Amino acid sequence: MSKIYHQISKKPGFMKHNGGLFFRDLTKDKYQFKTKIKKNHINKVGITHGGYIASIIDAGAGTAVYRSAGNKVCVTISLDIKYIGSSKIGDEIIGDVKIQKVTNTLVFMNCELRSKKNKIAIASGVWKKLNKKL
């Protein structure tokens, strides 16, 4: 698997516009992504906006799901996020994704989002496999 992170937000779109994500495969069912918090990710109280946290979990975990599904396009059916900490400008955020199960039509995963100082969020989700490849 890879020790090196690769930019996954190369094409114009939401994630590239918001700073992009870096991603790496750890094992056949464990993946990791990261990004750095910037000024435009912060809410009025000075911490990372919850919507941005949800977006990076959806994009990072979605990439893990895509790879675990044999590079088939998958769409999010459900994503349950528990916000349990915060981050601020300059923090590097790391997401650890564990694929729990892959069926003929669905992929189940768990994700933990953290900075060096604390756990930020935990999530679980289900993705639907489509019969498409990118």
Regions found by a protein language model. Name each.
Residues 1-134:
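Terminal targeting signals and extreme-terminal segments of soluble enzymes
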